[in-house]
Amino acid sequence: MEEFKTVRELFETFNYGDRINLDSITEIELEGWVKTNRNNGSIGFIELNDGTYFKNIQLVYDKNILGDEEFDKVSHYLTGSALDVKGKFILTPESKQPFEVQVTSIELEGDVDESYPLQKKRHSFEYLREIQHLRPRTNTFNAVFRLRSVLSMAIHEFFQNQGFVYVHTPVLTGITCEGDDMFHVTTKDKDDAYFGRKTLLSGSGQIHVESFCLAFRDVYTFGPTFRSEKSNTRTHASEFWMIEPEIAFADLDDDMSLIEDCVTYCIKYVLENCEEEMKFFNNFVDKTLLDRLNHVLNTPFTIA
């Protein structure tokens, strides 16, 4: 009976050095999407990603095992195809990848055609903007949004461990924030105010969370923020997520210590929990990234 595993489970078991558990895996079942598919006429190789881990797992399909007809069918599976795969789990310590799956059966769960726009090459951000529904399948966006997920968890974990109360502040508000340009929420009839008064998309939860600070002492809000500055540059964000802590009975030194502790905690958390994503960013986006982050961790803020 095949044992269902995710790619993350396999790599984490390998990374933890748990050879006994890996050796115990013989027959395995995987589900995922084709990243690449190539063959030499008798043996083929599929890079499969199941969405649980940044790295792919290699599938090896053999004409002698599958038969001519099945081999030919599998060899035509395109990038983006969804597969259910069963096979033998094999450790390959001498190869580039630590393990692979020798396919014994493979089912096509979802097909794509020749027009599928993502191929084995780097695509520009401008091109990917035209196919936004497929961007999460690219390495860059996959890494970015996995990182955002992990970093959000780190932020909450840091403040919760410090005893802070998480406050949900409203997105729709009648309060302006520090003179920032704000988006107005209206109906089709602009003279008929939706709430009978001026209503805005929040530029900050600060005003709301300050009142909670005077009841709970240490609080924070972490959520979407909107700014309507007239800028269409690539570096301008009209919507982003912002952390806003408020602490009572504190001075500037307390504020700075909180910021420093939060920054270092989040960096450590990301480096530990997004190792492959951070390697990708360091190799293909900013080759100084890991050096700079480690510099922050290892250098006092007074001289960093």
PLM feature segments, named:
Residues M1-A304:
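Class II aminoacyl-tRNA synthetase catalytic cores and aaRS-like
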